[in-house]
Amino acid sequence: MIQKNWQELIKPNKVDFITHGSRAHATVVAEPLERGFGLTLGNALRRVLLSSLRGAAVTAVQIDGVLHEFSSIPGVREDVTDIVLNIKEIAIRMEGEGPKRMVVRKEGPGVVTAGDIQTVGDVEILNPEHAICTLDEGAEICMEFTVNTGKGYVPADRNRAEDAPIGLIPVDSLYSPVRKVSYKIENTREGQVLDYDKLTLNIETNGSVTGEDAVAYAARILQDQLSIFVNFEEPQKEAPQEQVAELAFNPALLKKVDELELSVRSANCLKNDNIVYIGDLIQKTEAEMLRTPNFGRKSLNEIKEVLASMGLHLGMEIPAWPPENIEDLAKRYEDQY
């Protein structure tokens, strides 16, 4: 009864991921959804996508000859404030955890771009064409960047360490790899019902993560956060018991002859004649058994006595023997004989 609260709600029978020629843009379409669930899920996913996914960003910069962000640099057209604003827009992918250091050195004339930055092994600049500043003839600039990982938006004053050296300028850090998210809700049909929701999410990232992966991470975050509110255990479905097909012969015939507690001589004779199962044995006649090397009348009588105690005898005919899956059948029926 309880599980009907969620089991009988309709769930999307398909989720389409549409790329637009790059990692940075994607459209996600999910349908059908219960009426109102498009807005519920769309709004929740959008908020998590924008605020809660981890990424990498520049947290501070140190420029040779500059003591604070209100300085100007000879031969550089932009002042330090504008340079810092441009640094904030550098898109970075970093595999490991920070902090890491990056350096750029360049002489003018020319434009200093993000592609001029010398990165370490697990740091990648995703928008190398992004302009940082412009140098005049004879001008030179050297900057060292601190890169770290985090989530959301962290203002510059929180990136300022108490023991920061003079000249280290903190930078506002936008860690989120997701730049824009929008969604729309449309009507869709399922069978004869016309008032279900269709959710379309449009996602733009900085390229460090695909739109499809970003949605997957956001959904996982929501799943983890909501699980704490579930205060009951779901009833377990009983697995249907496997139906064992009836055999065309006595299951005791699947027992191996080495379990019959025969004398060593008799057991060795059967082994040498490739008689493995009782079903193999009882199909033999007395004459066939006596033709077995080293098999005498004493061994024959011993075997006849053991078989008689099981209601069996030599020379029996068994339909459908040996079965193709004899080893599997022997394991399945071993508790029944």
Swiss-Prot record:
Any single Gene Ontology cellular-component annotation: DNA-directed RNA polymerase complex
Main enzyme class: transferase
Keyword Transmembrane on entry: no
Residue segments, region Alpha N-terminal domain (alpha-NTD): 1-233
Signal among keywords: no
Alpha C-terminal domain (alpha-CTD), as annotated region: 249-337
Keywords: DNA-directed RNA polymerase, Nucleotidyltransferase, Transcription, Transferase
GO biological process terms, semicolon-separated: DNA-templated transcription
Its biological purpose: DNA-dependent RNA polymerase catalyzes the transcription of DNA into RNA using the four ribonucleoside triphosphates as substrates.
Name of the featured protein: DNA-directed RNA polymerase subunit alpha
